């Protein structure tokens, strides 16, 4: 199963770390997007996942999506995807 995260901040990082540590999903099966380059680089370094700046790429490649953006960005993000 390919898992996609829109947003790779603290909430997403905790979820990713837990599922990878438990062996539920391998890092290679996770893709995450973040508008901030620093966020993408941190997720790639800490979790070994594929990262992108493109939310649409995540929606196209993932079977399951996790929306992990701040509440004030929900409407904008949902409209985009």
For the regions a language model picked out, list residue spans one by one.
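Rossmann-fold NAD(P) dinucleotide-binding segment
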Residues: 50-81
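NAD(P)+-binding Rossmann beta1-loop-alpha1 motif at the extreme N-terminus of oxidoreductases
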Residues: 1-46, 50-53, 57
